UniProtKB/Swiss-Prot annotation:
It is an enzyme of class 2 (transferase). GO terms for molecular function: ATP binding; UMP kinase activity. InterPro entries: AceGlu_kinase-like_sf (IPR036393), Asp/Glu/Uridylate_kinase (IPR001048), Uridylate_kinase (IPR011817), Uridylate_kinase_bac (IPR015963). Catalyzes the reversible phosphorylation of UMP to UDP. This is Uridylate kinase. PANTHER family: URIDYLATE KINASE (PTHR42833), URIDYLATE KINASE PUMPKIN, CHLOROPLASTIC (PTHR42833:SF4). It comes from Xanthomonas axonopodis pv. citri (strain 306).
Amino acid sequence: MSELSYRRILLKLSGEALMGDGDYGIDPKVINRLAHEVIEAQQAGAQVALVIGGGNIFRGAGLAASGMDRVTGDHMGMLATVINALAMQDALEKLGAKVRVMSAIKINDVCEDFIRRRAIRHLEKGRIAIFAAGTGNPFFTTDSGAALRAIEIGADLLLKATKVDGVYDKDPKKHTDAVRYDSLTYDRVILQGLEVMDTAAFALARDSDLPLRIFGMSEPGVLLRILHGEQIGTLVQGRS
């Protein structure tokens, strides 16, 4: 195959991606399949970092709407991302990978604190880095956390795996005539309100000239194909 188009990537997975067909928690078969995909990408020569959401366990914003204090709910959501990060670490290590979980909040008995230089060093040494607890601040989603960490580690590409195979002009599950975009600018995504990531994450990536590819990860080998330059999903970059 061709040479890699990207040498350092950050892959954002939703917590829901770990559920499989279930309504809650982690499906071992699903997390093992995702772990295989990540290791395949690393073995091809890429430095790989991960951010995983926590929606399969807890959503702070949802309970805040029901009356829970938003800050408390967001802190609980951060802990959910740590649970998912540890689960992914276990799955990757069982396949022989060297992995470090780094948290934005202090939880030193189970993972490291996020320190930028240390995170980059882990990647340079061939370890997979999993960044947990978002930005460490309430009111910010794990999408924003993923964009921030990707910028901090100098990633060549931010990847967001979704349930659909890119960005559409309308919901493809509800509209059979929905059209998928091959590429978009950040300004157009924000202006049109295309809700595939939150606006803060889009703006952060735009202002740092970080390209973003949104794609579906249901097909085996898709991550490796993207690393080799295949135009899969929707590429978001630049300004209008």
